[in-house]
A protein has these predicted regions:
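Flexible, membrane-associating and regulatory peripheral segments of lipid-active enzymes
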Residues: 2, 6-11, 19-139, 145, ...
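Serine-dependent carboxylesterase/thioesterase catalytic core
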Residues: 33, 119, 167-283, 327
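Extracellular/periplasmic catalytic domains that process cell-envelope and extracellular macromolecules
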Residues: 107-110, 181-183, 190-192, 208-212, ...
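Glycine-rich "HGGG/HGxG" loop immediately N-terminal to the catalytic nucleophile
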Residues: 149-162, 227
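Serine-hydrolase catalytic core
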Residues: 262-331
């Protein structure tokens, strides 16, 4: 049984989780269109932020983006060759990206599969880092490459990463895939952080017909769920909008990393609540009852055979772990390991000892025995991989 490194501050974290799981007075000056009085009492932070998203979506998205940037949750935002993108507005970046892809399409191998990206929390397909890595991947492999947003612009795409639930996000993603003629013969997929849940959800629900995921590169995915409050520094923003916020993004995540995640309201309005997997055995029944992740894992008390059948249609799975990941707990979950129920905060079960493997709940064991699972890692924190690593991964696993 492998040992896990766990922060000495666990006592403080658990205390804060308890604080945010109890009732807090969340009276607002205007009627919250999403929340009943009970919702506001049980989910004060989520309700407050949902209201602000409705009132000023652009300001909220800018705030979330800045917070993600400060915490290094974004892919490639500090790459040296991003400056040309950083000088342009989101709409110009998207237009430029489309033109570049169209210009090179004539020289592409028509038989090679395109690449589809799903971004992580706080990021957006309209941001420079995602635009840059999408372009790089297409050029490396000589294929059509696209990042699929879950909103019509940067603001909606960013906000939806927090406030559109996981299942609805997958439906939006799937509709975009179905409407793109270049993806109808199948594609290879790359997920970053919680974007892996989008790809995974697509495989679970939509991996049928011809538009199937051939190979799935999962980089620092919360595949096995999130079991603790992720590394999160409070925002440094001094903007007028930030002053309107009574709560910080870290407090929002902390509220979802608690009993508050396991309610119908949280599951409907919070992407992060959908994959909160409380590692304590006492919490497992509520996880089974409420969490979207439990349904996709076939942990909800019944087996959906369609999920297993759809999983089997993907030929290659590449699971990438960051050795110092401070966002995903346990970080070994990026390799489908899970907290040991007997000591959930200090020890993990190897993948082959987990229940989802031994019982082959959704097809992980079948895929492993067929040689479909591959495991990679890089030294460093969440999403801080090198371009050399990225190029090696896609050339090795997408070039087959």
């Amino acid at each position: 049984m492998a040992n896990m490194v766990f922060s000495a501050t666990i006592g403080a974290v658990l205390a804060l989780m308890l604080i945010f799981s109890v009732s807090i007075d969340a009276t607002t000056s205007t009627q919250n269109i999403f929340c009943t009085t009970d919702d506001e009492r049980n989910h004060p932070i989520l309700c407050h932020m949902l209201q602000l998203v409705e009132e000023d979506p652009r300001e909220m998205a800018d705030y979330l983006y800045q917070h993600a940037q400060e915490n290094k949750w974004l892919v490639g935002h500090d790459w040296s060759d991003d400056s040309e993108f950083g000088k342009m507005s989101s709409s110009v970046v998207a237009s430029t990206m489309s033109r570049q892809l169209l210009r090179s399409s004539a020289s592409k191998d028509d038989n090679a599969l395109p690449i589809v990206f799903a971004h992580g929390m706080g990021d957006s397909c309209f941001n420079s880092g995602m635009q840059s890595i999408t372009k790089k991947a297409g050029e490396m492999m000589g294929v059509y490459s696209v990042c699929i947003p879950t909103g019509k612009d940067q603001s909606e795409d960013t906000n939806n990463g927090f406030f559109l639930n996981m299942d609805a996000t997958v439906d939006v993603f799937a509709e975009a895939v179905q409407n793109d003629p270049k993806l109808q013969n199948g594609f290879n997929a790359i997920g970053f952080s919680q974007g892996n849940n989008v790809i995974r959800g697509y495989i679970a629900k939509y991996n049928t017909g011809t538009a199937v995921v051939n190979a799935f590169l999962s980089i620092n995915g919360v595949n096995a769920g999130e079991g603790a409050v992720p590394h999160c520094n409070p925002s440094l923003s001094k903007s007028p909008f930030a002053q309107k916020l009574r709560f910080d993004v870290c407090e929002l995540l902390m509220e979802q990393a608690s009993r508050a995640a396991y309610t119908d309201f949280a599951q409907q309005h919070s992407f992060q609540a959908n994959y909160w997997r409380d590692p304590r055995p006492s919490a497992f029944p509520r996880y089974q009852q409420y969490a979207q992740l439990a349904k996709w894992n076939n942990e909800a008390g019944f087996v959906n055979q369609t999920l297993k059948d759809n999983w089997a249609k993907t030929n290659t799975f590449v699971w990438v772990l960051a050795t110092e990941d401070g966002m995903v707990f346990p970080r070994e979950g990026e390799w489908w390991q899970s907290p040991d129920p007997n000591d959930p905060y200090h020890s993990v079960l190897p993948m082959k000892e987990t229940e989802w493997y031994t019982k082959d709940l959704f097809g992980l064991k079948t895929a492993d025995e067929a040689g479909k699972n591959h495991f990679e890692k890089f030294e460093g924190d969440h999403l801080q991989f090198s371009m050399e690593d990225f190029e090696r991964w896609i050339k090795e696993y997408f070039g087959k």
